Design a protein with these regions (language model features):
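Long, contiguous amphipathic alpha-helices that act as assembly "spine/axial" helices in icosahedral shell
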Residues: 83-163, 184, 190-208, 323-329
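Glycine- and small hydrophobic-enriched segments that form the cores of compact globular domains
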Residues: 163-180, 187-190
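Ordered core of a single globular domain
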Residues: 183-240
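Extended, non-catalytic scaffold segments that flank or surround catalytic motifs
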Residues: 50, 55, 154-164, 179
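A general structural signal for short secondary-structure junctions and capping/turn motifs
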Residues: 34, 192-197, 202, 316-319, ...
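Assembly/oligomerization interface modules of large self-assembling protein complexes
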Residues: 32-101
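Sequence/fold signature of self-assembling virion shell proteins
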Residues: 219-349
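N-terminal alpha-helical "arm" segments
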Residues: 1-43, 336-349
Length: 349
């Protein structure tokens, strides 16, 4: 069925049918997608797990009230993402990418094809942005939001801070001969277990850290003696699961699966950067975080404001003065961890 690019609801349905590109950090740590909020503001509540002991009472005495684990709640206006593409008549007179050299495609057909491709492309840029938000939260506990004012050049900066405190400081860097990587991971796991009450099972590392682990003397000391106890501790058989995602192996004694995440993004200045730093590592509990989306309000063709409760809200605009078609995809999203103690960051070098 053809897509009606002039109708926002039709475009929203089309995006929902599209298969979203994979995003390792989002899929691993923030896979839950609750219903979209009906306003642009989202209540973000964070908490630390309590460890209160039940009080004893003497015979015949009544109960004793205990204090609940506290939480902090903040009301955020979910940041708006709004990438767009523009099509003008000159583009329609040229052969599209991968189109036959000798083509019978009309400009109208080429326009429909380009807009369908743009719809998928714009969705991908939003997912990349959410993946960057996930990387920032996992490595710093904060998410810096930089947007542009109406002039298109002035940068406005805001920040969502979850007051994250689980940075692991190492006594010996992992690229050094005396590094005890196994014990460092054990201590980091125990810290998460103590504060979050759950065993972390996923370790995501930058591209250099895989080599540090596989070359580490303290780990190879166990592997060099192939007895039953040592073999049951580690299993390393690196393989690519997808482009830029490499499964390194499993540390069975700590219940940890190790992944090297090599994916990069291009910043506003055109520089290529890694989502996870080359020497960074994140140990965490998977499948608990949420992607909370908020409603988007747009001006419709009748010059009235309409609110759309959707994850992705495409909008089509035709300007007859400039003879341009603009397709924009809007999305409001805040990433919310279940608890702020679900992960720990390790600067390995």
């Amino acid at each position: 069925m053809a897509i009606d690019f002039k109708d926002t609801f039709s475009l929203m349905q089309a995006v929902e049918r599209m298969k979203a590109p994979a995003s390792f950090l989002l899929d691993t740590f923030f896979p839950q997608v609750p219903a979209v909020a009906t306003s642009k503001k989202i209540a973000v509540e964070t908490r630390k797990r309590g460890r209160t002991l039940a009080p004893f009472v003497s015979r015949g005495a009544s109960s004793v009230n205990v204090k609940r684990s506290g939480s902090k709640i903040a009301l955020y206006e979910a940041p708006m993402m709004g990438p767009s593409t523009v099509i003008d008549p000159e583009q329609l007179d040229q052969r599209a990418f991968a189109e036959n050299i000798v083509s019978t495609m009309t400009p109208a057909q080429r326009s429909a094809q380009m807009q369908a491709e743009d719809l998928s492309y714009l969705q991908g840029t939003i997912i990349n942005r959410k993946n960057k938000m996930a990387a920032d939260l996992l490595t710093t506990g904060k998410c810096k939001i930089e947007g542009y004012a109406d002039d298109g050049t002035t940068v406005l900066t805001d920040e969502i801070d979850f007051e994250f405190e689980q940075d692991i400081t190492l006594t010996t860097a992992w690229d050094q001969a005396g590094a005890d990587i196994y014990n460092d991971l054990k201590l980091a796991s125990e810290k998460i277990q103590e504060n979050a009450g759950i065993v972390p099972t996923v370790l995501v590392v930058g591209k250099n850290v895989e080599k540090y682990i596989l070359d580490n003397a303290s780990i190879n000391k166990f592997l060099a003696i192939p007895n039953r106890e040592n073999i049951s501790m580690f299993s390393f058989a690196p393989e690519y699961l997808s482009p830029q995602v490499r499964y390194v192996g499993r540390i069975m004694s700590l219940n940890i699966d190790v992944y090297a995440y090599l994916e990069t993004y291009q910043d506003a200045e055109g520089k290529v950067k890694a989502f996870i730093g080359d020497d960074a590592a994140v140990l965490g509990v998977p499948d608990r975080g949420r992607q909370q989306h908020a409603a988007v309000t747009l001006l419709n063709d009748d010059n009235q404001f309409t609110t759309y409760a959707g994850i992705y809200v495409p909008n089509y605009y035709a300007n007859k003065d400039t003879q341009e078609l603009k397709l924009t995809v809007y999305s409001r999203c805040v990433l919310i961890p279940e608890t702020i103690d679900d992960w720990a960051t390790i600067k390995t070098k």
